[in-house]
Amino acid sequence: MTLTLHQLFPTVVATTKLAIDPIDLAGHLQTLLALRGEAVGNPCEGCAWTGDINGVWQLHRQPEFAPLAQQVAEQAMRYLEAVGFDCSRVALHLQRCWPVLSDWDQLVGRHHHPNAHLSAVLYLTGNGSGEEGVLRVHSPLQSNELVSGLAAGHGGPIARDHPFNAETWDLAPEGGLLVLFPSRLDHSVLTNGDPESLRGSISFDFALSAPEQGNPPEYLAPHPSQWSLCADLTS
């Protein structure tokens, strides 16, 4: 008798490789290092430097990075199509675009992006070994552990790292690798363990709205062009 396992309600993380000229890549890294300036990280010790909290959150508006942003936006639309969206009935907006630079022994703690709907990260460095710190995606729900907390281990009966009870999924950075995932998904970046390597990436936050024309669906925000600033309202 066969026991058939049905893996339901998958969370989709998409990956692809962008073709980036090595000379352009080196230039992008130099620009990002210049934007970081004398800073070595974020205020918390051991944290990577992230542009979003240091005033560098609109890289897509800089001519140097606009072509990269366009490529990423195209892949974001492909992601929407792949998970079932009719792209003629939504508008996709790029909210933020910022660099993340991680020197040796620096990391990014577990977090998600509640202000956005779809997020992406484009790696400018990495050789696939993971030594510079992997991207770790955290499972939002451990349905298959049956008993809450059991999959955490500590001598429990569930096989360690079993694919049906995995708490995390790791992805090693490579230059040109693009990753897209739901913004609500918790993720982190493990410590850069290579004292000779800089881990460099660019993050993107996208938001969905209804198209500018037509009536918006019930659960999709109207297009921002149809919003009104409350301070500008008159009686």
Name these PLM-found stretches:
Residues 79-83, 94, 99-109:
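Short acidic (Asp/Glu) patches
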Residues 88-90:
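Histidine-dependent nucleotide/RNA phosphoesterase domain, centered on the 2H-phosphoesterase fold
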Residues 93, 111-113, 187:
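Histidine-centered active-site/metal-ligand motif
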Residues 100-178, 212:
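Catalytic core of non-heme Fe(II) oxygenases with the double-stranded beta-helix
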Residues 159-235:
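Catalytic core of Fe(II)/2-oxoglutarate
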